Amino acid sequence: MTLGLEQAEEQRLYQQTLLQDGLKDMLDHGKFLDCVVRVGEREFPCHRLVLAACSPYFRARFLAEPDSAGEVRLEEVSPDVVSQVLHYLYTSEIALDEASVQDLFAAAHRFQIPSIFTICVSFLQKRLCLANCLAVFRLGLLLDCARLAVAARDFICARFPLVARDNDFLGLSADELIAIISSDGLNVEKEEAVFEAVMRWASSGDAEAQAERQRALPTVFESVRCRLLPRAFLETRVERHPLVRSQPELLRKVQMVKDAHEGRLTTLRKKKKEKGEQTARAKEANQGTEDTKAEDDEERVLPGILNDTLRFGMFLQDLIFMISEEGAVAYDPAANECYCASLSTQIPKNHVSLVTKENQVFVAGGLFYNEDNKEDPMSAYFLQFDHLDSEWLGMPPLPSPRCLFGLGEALNAIYVVGGRELKDSEDSLDSVLCYDRLSFKWGESDPLPYAVYGHTVLSHMDLVYVIGGKGKDRKCLNKMCVYDPKKFEWKELAPMQTARSLFGATVHDGRIFVAAGVTDTGLTSSSEVYSIADNKWTSFEAFPQERSSLSLVSLAGTLYALGGFATLETESGELVPTELNDIWRYNEDEKKWEGVLREIAYAAGATFLPVRLNVVRLTKM
């Protein structure tokens, strides 16, 4: 009678457990021990049968040297590592950590113990990070573990701009570098980043290392997709680079690329592989027609340097990023397509969002209760969007919870400006919190010249602008000031024509645009534009409807207006604030606002940012 799969598996596990527990018990009580493993000064009594059953390495040693099988001396391995390996063979238990995993991995490879090898591979894969990815990649290549090497390479490719800055990147061998930069999965927007990384690599190290790398440069260059480089960059940067000019072979390669830009492709002849002796004999018999059939025996291929396949990171598109407590959705106004970026519901309802010039997205706001902090348990959420994994990462929480504040960025720092305290007093704030993106720590920055909330904060050219809002007397302000982090000072600028709060604002075409909002007399539709160069405000085409909390977004040279609240009349004739989820676009030629969408899903309660995302990673909705 055939046993069911579950019953058969249960019986197998029972027998395995019985066998393993029995062997461990005999080891602990010194029964039937017939072998000693010596590592330095330490000895490990054990059973030859266990070692031979689990390791082809030990099995081969015992069979090759039967007379000395009672003692095994191991060199170039730590006693602690051997102790862990033997403990695993008898118990199936192993304690891995970042400090020991590489030594155990190497031991498992040397002693040919596939189970420990697989456990180490899984451990390293799960803990891949910027700090260890290059070391893990090299380890995978060294131990001939394709699974680990490919996982680490893919991790490196996905974060290439960051990894290429690491000093460990400069320590790669030519073959290791080629394995990375030849990948289609390289996450770079422009091939210029690959060229610059290769040049830094070739110029690093001592004189001997530089000479060796420069000899390998023609081979490495085959993996730089120079046809993707703009012609101007090719002529001004690549062709004139000292390392390129010093090698005629590299100059010939650059000329091939320039010819390709003009439509003249250089091809190489590559002999087709012969198929057995019959092909060879047939070729010999037809010696007289060799010249006429030469083309049949060869195939033409493009040199590697003429490869123009786009990298993975070159599929970035300009999108409007809508962030709400329901999730994050990216909208492509050019194609009228929506993409799901994240279904996470950890975004606080009342939040402020920011996109940096490096295209990093941050969210701050809401209330976070930290029960471990007895003195001041209340803080606010601070999250960063991970483009690669499409998820929100928890960052050090905002130490001072507040609402109606603004977010700005300059010089690797993020600024939380003004707002109102989330306390009974609801005091207006002039304080500015500063988050250092390099040290991942919060601190205090220079306070504002005045307390403000409901204002807008914009960033441009490493300066932080604060516009409008309401002061301590709850009156709307027309003030505008700018913070220069290099000088650690605030400076007041020309005031707006209309005092307002809760309005839309953005930097577009090198100028600051504001639209709609709340005034002391109610909602407004008025708009104005500020010339940064002239420090002057002028009127702009009014928005078609009076609104508060309108969002302005500058995307790919076009100015968009999204959402907000308007006062609408209900069927009963009552006027109530109503949230709108529409999209408008400003027509530069006709100087007017045009409706794009009457309503877009997922925009309710959202903040809007202009971002560049890789649509290959996103799911079309």
Curated annotation (Swiss-Prot):
Occurrences of domain BACK (ranges): 133-239
Induction comment from the UniProt entry of this chain: Up-regulated during myogenic differentiation. Induced during the differentiation of myoblasts into myotubes.
Location within or outside the cell: Cytoplasm; Cytoplasm, Myofibril, Sarcomere, A band; Cytoplasm, Myofibril, Sarcomere, I band
Cited Gene3D superfamilies: 1.25.40.420, Kelch-type beta propeller (2.120.10.80), Potassium Channel Kv1.1, Chain A (3.30.710.10)
Tissue spec. comment: Specifically expressed in skeletal muscles in embryonic, neonatal and adults. Expressed in various types of muscles, including extensor digitorum longus, gastrocnemius, soleus, diaphragm, masseter and heart (at protein level). Not detected in brain, liver and lung (at protein level).
KO phenotype (gene knockout): Neonates are normal in size at birth and were born with the expected Mendelian ratio. They however fail to gain weight and do not survive to weaning. Defects are due to smaller muscle fibers and a disorganized sarcomeric structure.
Positions of region (Disordered): 265-298
Keyword Cytoplasm: yes
Biased composition range(s): Basic and acidic residues: 274-284
Pfam families xrefs: BACK (PF07707), BTB (PF00651), Kelch_KLHDC2_KLHL20_DRC7 (PF24681)
Keywords: Cytoplasm, Developmental protein, Kelch repeat, Repeat, Ubl conjugation pathway
One GO CC term on file: Cul3-RING ubiquitin ligase complex
Origin superkingdom: Eukaryota
InterPro entries: BACK, BTB-kelch_protein, BTB/POZ_dom, Kelch-typ_b-propeller, Kelch_1, SKP1/BTB/POZ_sf
TM spans (from-to): none
Ranges occupied by Kelch repeats: 360-412, 413-462, 463-510, 512-557, 559-613
SMART domains: BACK (SM00875), BTB (SM00225), Kelch (SM00612)
Domain BTB: 33-98
Role noted for this protein: Substrate-specific adapter of a BCR (BTB-CUL3-RBX1) E3 ubiquitin ligase complex that acts as a key regulator of skeletal muscle development. The BCR(KLHL40) complex acts by mediating ubiquitination and degradation of TFDP1, thereby regulating the activity of the E2F:DP transcription factor complex. Promotes stabilization of LMOD3 by acting as a negative regulator of LMOD3 ubiquitination; the molecular process by which it negatively regulates ubiquitination of LMOD3 is however unclear.
Subunit structure: Component of the BCR(KLHL40) E3 ubiquitin ligase complex, at least composed of CUL3, KLHL40 and RBX1. Interacts with LMOD3.
Protein name per its UniProtKB record: Kelch-like protein 40
UniProt organism field: Mus musculus (Mouse)
Gene: Klhl40
